[in-house]
């Protein structure tokens, strides 16, 4: 990361896409997409997804590392080219507890990530815990971030410190996505970004972390990009010029969250304006979901009723029976809920892919379709971009490759924005 940031600060148009997903097909796509390039691939886990207690994926940081490396071995991607990052590391998972208890767990969380070899660490202590004022004072946020940084430094080896980098600050909304519809977004003001940096510098120095400050590579701000389940707020470069100019005076870049669904031209503008780390998650699993739904429609027409997977029906049944991952985000009313379950840009389906019933139904669908020749006309109907690539000889009409290429479409837009 440090080399890339140095190149950007030296004037190169270069950025990096941060792949925030634990889905094996998304990680496989991210690695396969850049297998024949010289670029590094940044893959990040969030604190609620992967933590010392397993998170909602059931994986500790060390488990996640081995999970990613196993996929890299399968793809033929050198693990030395993988950068592992931890996102929103702090009290996010334990906000219902008092600050002392939540921070104690947060310290162990950060240590677990660093011990597991994660080299990009987002120190985010912005969440209020039980008994805390809402919002927290910037000084409190910075002091808690310094405690987390101290934890990271205490377990990092000398070799690790050469690669270790920190990201500070946070954006709105908190990790997980918007819980309600959005119409506009508040762009971070320069004075707020400057205050975030100033308070963190003061807190770090007070804890003897002056050297660690040199490892702070980025600050998270809101550049004016956001999405919810039905809306996308697109980047307006002219609105972020004050931020772009301010960061030029520092040794850092910006990290932009929720950049999913922006145009490829917007990604290029964001990188030009020093939002050099672009995070993406739901857009990748949304593309996966689109591919699975398309293949399910193809299966419906090609496979005998008694042998079909019933994939789409299984997904809906499971999500309606177990609504905990979408209920507070989606619209009420049965019809609206169904539309959001299927097509929401927030893509809460991503939490359900590991469910045994859904996983088994998708596997059945894939086996069914691998055993037949999919007519080109059906691929044109349901996956038109992939049809064009089949026609030009770039792609084969194999279900797994069709899913990969659908995910590549998202990665292609980021490559356009980030490429030197």
From Swiss-Prot:
A biological process term (GO) from this entry: galactitol metabolic process
Signal peptide start and end residues: none
Gene Ontology CC annotation, any one: plasma membrane
Keywords carried by this UniProt record: Galactitol metabolism
Pfam families: GatZ_KbaZ-like
Record has DNA-binding as a keyword: no
Keyword Glycoprotein carried by entry: no
Pathway: Carbohydrate metabolism; D-tagatose 6-phosphate degradation; D-glyceraldehyde 3-phosphate and glycerone phosphate from D-tagatose 6-phosphate: step 2/2
Subunit and partners: Forms a complex with GatY.
PANTHER family: D-TAGATOSE-1,6-BISPHOSPHATE ALDOLASE SUBUNIT GATZ, N-ACETYLGALACTOSAMINE PERMEASE II COMPONENT-RELATED
Entries under NCBIfam families matching the protein: agaZ_gatZ, PRK15052.1
Family recorded in the similarity comment: Belongs to the GatZ/KbaZ family. GatZ subfamily.
Function: Component of the tagatose-1,6-bisphosphate aldolase GatYZ that is required for full activity and stability of the Y subunit. Could have a chaperone-like function for the proper and stable folding of GatY. When expressed alone, GatZ does not show any aldolase activity. Is involved in the catabolism of galactitol.
The protein's name: D-tagatose-1,6-bisphosphate aldolase subunit GatZ
Native species: Escherichia coli O7:K1 (strain IAI39 / ExPEC)
Gene for this chain: gatZ
